[in-house]
Design a protein with these regions (language model features):
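Gram-negative outer-membrane beta-barrel transporters
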Residues: 349-351, 360-362, 369, 406-408, ...
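Membrane-embedded beta-barrel scaffold of Gram-negative outer-membrane proteins
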Residues: 191, 213, 219, 313-329, ...
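Conserved C-terminal beta-signal and adjacent last beta-strands/turns
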Residues: 6-10, 15-19, 23-25, 125, ...
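Transmembrane beta-barrel wall of Gram-negative outer-membrane proteins
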Residues: 193-225, 234-274, 291-305, 403-409, ...
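Flexible loop and strand-edge segments within Gram-negative outer membrane beta-barrel domains
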Residues: 226-227, 232-233, 237-243, 257-314, ...
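Acidic, small-polar-rich N-terminal luminal/periplasmic segments of exported/outer-membrane proteins
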Residues: 27, 35, 46-180, 198, ...
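Short loop/turn motifs that connect adjacent beta-strands in outer-membrane beta-barrel proteins
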Residues: 44, 159, 175-185, 211-214, ...
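Structural signature of Gram-negative outer-membrane beta-barrels, strongest in the C-terminal barrel
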Residues: 255, 386-543
């Protein structure tokens, strides 16, 4: 018998043309720490819709001007969500979501129907390569985050393997975020509570800047402690956890040309929950309760050289990450662990040219990174862990991209062709090595007939190399009862068990995609009031994805037959490949994914409204079955009123989902839902209380019982939230 799992885990106007000098000043150093604004400016940024994207083209541009879809969620919007985890903010991003359920330890992202190895995660440019069948991937506390970029669509032309569905890039806080002009030191302290899981949070940030502005330092420490999650269904989801997060970052500017920075970020999590923390999986035989310890460290160094010449704007980044998850079974002596280390270095440069009405930015560079994994299980003879091979992967890449803009009588045209070459190698002890390479081209184009209108399109190819987990998976996968024979204690005792083993497959080939996208956007200012703005951008995309990697699980059907149900010639039930009782990753499916995404934002001195819409469909080309991490049609709205020159903001959010019937098994269909949140922010911008911020709110105000499709469990119920913070500069 074969059980088949899901095959795929898987806004700027003409004025941007004149801002080229400003973005050049930001330069490639923005890949690690983008150009910043002081806290007084950031506090008023709730209406600043001209967010800058760093990762969409590796060259800072306004997100609106990108020839595709990218969302930039800035610090002020993140803070208004008063998030417990980064998953809380993803309603603000069309076409992207966090699945795996409400437990922090099981949250995984998906973008445009792809997840797992199909989505690249970057922390300040450092790749986060930790991947597990059931564990989460977001080892970062929201308190440390100054912006999140979600580039949707294939981006292998810049980032290589893994950017099949898109890139989620997290940018962490800097000292500049906390200091006004002339201030040399500052502190921020905060404390918060939310009722749905009885979570308390405390955090402290300290910053310092030298008299000559050449050196600055920022440090943060945050602790969260929470209990079980109260679901909208009325049930509790076991999820006791404690999170300790810290960040230390320093920047040195010896001259106007040079910027050097270094950082260390740590995420430590301890929780008591089932071995598989995703969905509504209860603890029990085969999914024992574990004391889970997460230790994630990211160290990074960055050097930017940006002299007066237009030919050099170079950025060198080196990083090391270590992510270790250890699980001690509560009721046994078994301990298992997975450790993934990544060392990487990238070098890129931007050369800029201008000739009359034309300008060209040529971005080019190379990258190398190495992943190494070690799995341990103290209950196996050789201490190795089933499904977690001791293996290494190496990636070498070189890329080039041109951004050519020409301003003529019919508007501004921009053409952005790019290409990247990658070579990748996988090795494991006692197994054959694998080698392959890929070329990933992409081209995007935009046209602005007038400054307020943008028309764009793009085409690109992307790939996702097979991971060492998929190629070299071996040892025990799971055990099942063998009902076809009496148990060791006879017919009235417990059954005998047989073992399903992983089988390596060195013949896997990369997943590949070809995507095209077309869209348009509008950008207006001074519509109803002086200084107000409205932006909207939408697109339709279609992706053809081939060679999808799927885990095939084969079990002899006779294992489920009693002795009196057996018939002559029936294959025996046993353990391993000899009996057909094995699991193996194979290339099995070609899929077509398509969808629509729309974002719109309005802001004024009196009120704001932002929202988005997304729909997606995914089909198996061979049999028309649904494939991918699909979701219902989604509408998200976030709006509110501003009082006392913005010192007080009252807002509300609503998420609306249609009925979900894009399923192969009717049992997996889900009803639609409408969920609303309310919130208030008091943040005096002047006077003696400047620096104080009070956040009050309630999520899921109606205590709705609803399921997010990719979560597999009812979502958290009504959740009252409160946070108080104070910031002072000196």
């Amino acid at each position: 018998m074969m059980k088949r799992q899901d095959a795929i885990r898987g806004l700027g106007g003409e004025r941007a043309f004149f801002k080229a000098a400003l973005f050049r000043a930001a330069g490639a150093a923005a890949l690690a720490t983008v150009s910043t604004v002081g806290p007084a400016q950031a506090d008023m940024a709730a209406g600043d819709l001209d967010e800058v994207t760093v990762y969409a083209t590796r060259n800072p541009i306004e997100a609106f001007d990108y020839a595709g879809q990218v969302s930039v969620i800035p610090k002020d919007v993140i803070d208004d969500f008063n998030p417990s985890s980064l998953a809380d903010i993803f309603d603000a991003v069309p076409g992207a979501a966090i699945g795996g359920g409400p437990r922090r330890s099981g949250m995984t992202p998906d973008v445009r129907g792809l997840s797992g190895e199909g989505v690249l995660i970057l922390f300040d440019g450092a790749r986060q390569s930790y991947l597990s069948g059931h564990d989460g991937r977001f080892f970062v506390d929201p308190e440390l985050v100054r912006a999140v970029e979600v580039v949707r669509g294939p981006t292998s032309a810049l980032y290589g393997s893994g950017a099949l569905g898109g890139v989620i890039a997290v940018r962490t806080i800097t000292a500049q975020d906390f200091l006004d002009e002339g201030q040399r030191a500052g502190v921020k302290v905060s404390s918060g509570y939310q009722s749905v899981n009885d979570e308390w949070r405390m955090g402290a940030t300290g910053v310092w800047r030298s008299e000559d502005d050449k050196v600055d330092v920022v440090g943060n420490f945050t602790i969260r402690n929470s209990g079980d999650i109260e679901l909208g269904s009325g049930l509790d989801l076991e999820a006791d956890d404690e999170i300790l997060s810290s960040l230390l970052k320093t920047t040195f500017r010896p001259s106007e040309e040079w910027t050097l920075s270094a950082s260390w970020m740590r995420y430590g999590g301890n929780s008591v929950d089932p071995n598989n923390p995703q969905g509504n999986n209860p603890a029990g035989p085969g999914n024992e309760n574990v004391d889970r310890d997460i230790d994630s460290n990211t160290l990074q160094g960055n050097v930017n050289y940006n002299p007066a010449t237009n030919l050099i704007d170079a950025n060198l980044v080196g990083y090391f990450t270590r992510n270790t998850v250890t699980e001690d079974e509560i009721d046994t002596t078994r301990t298992v662990s997975r450790e993934v280390e990544t060392f990487g270095v990238s070098l890129d440069n931007r050369s800029r040219f201008e000739a009359g009405p034309a300008s060209l930015t040529f971005t080019y560079g190379g990258e190398f990174y190495r992943d190494e994994q070690v799995g341990r299980d103290n209950m196996t003879a050789d201490m190795t862990r089933g499904g977690v091979p001791d293996a290494t992967a190496k990636f070498y890449g070189a890329f080039a991209q041109a951004e050519l803009s020409v301003k003529g009588p019919v508007g501004l045209f921009t053409l952005v062709p790019g290409v990247r070459w990658d070579r990748f190698e996988n090795d494991a002890v006692g197994e054959p090595s694998t080698r392959d390479e890929a070329v990933s081209p992409k081209v995007g184009a935009t046209w602005k007939p007038v400054p307020q209108l943008l028309v764009f399109g793009n085409w690109g190819q992307a790939f996702r190399a097979p991971s060492f987990n998929e190629i070299y998976a071996d040892n025990v996968h799971f055990q099942i009862p063998n009902l076809s024979v009496p148990g060791p204690l006879g017919p009235f005792g417990p059954p005998a068990f047989v073992t399903n083993f992983f089988i390596p497959n060195p013949d896997l080939v990369p997943e590949e995609s070809e995507t095209w996208e077309v869209g348009a956007g509008v950008d207006f200012e001074n519509i109803l009031f002086d200084g107000d703005s409205f932006m909207a951008k939408g697109s339709y995309y279609q992706s053809d994805v081939t060679n999808l990697i799927d885990l095939e699980v084969n079990i002899p059907f006779t294992c489920f037959l009693t002795p009196d149900q057996l018939f002559p010639g029936a294959p025996p039930c046993g353990s391993g490949e000899a009996f057909g009782n094995y699991s193996r990753n194979v290339n099995v499916t070609n899929a077509e994914l398509d969808g629509v995404e729309v974002e719109a934002q309005y802001d004024s001195a009196y009120f704001w409204l932002r929202g988005n819409f997304a729909t997606i469909d995914g089909r198996d080309v061979a049999n028309d079955d649904y494939v991918g991490v699909l979701s219902p049609d989604m509408i998200f709205l976030d709006g509110g009123l501003k009082f006392f020159s913005g010192d007080l903001r009252l807002g509300a959010r609503v998420s609306i989902a249609s009925d979900f019937n894009k399923v192969n098994d009717p049992a997996n269909a889900r009803d639609g839902y409408t969920v609303g949140d309310v919130y208030a922010v008091w943040q005096p911008m002047s006077g003696k209380l400047k620096g104080l911020r009070v956040d009050l709110g309630a999520d899921n105000v109606t205590d709705a019982d609803y399921d997010v499709v990719a979560a597999g469990v009812s979502q958290p119920g009504r959740n009252f939230k409160a946070t108080v913070s104070w910031r002072q500069g000196f």
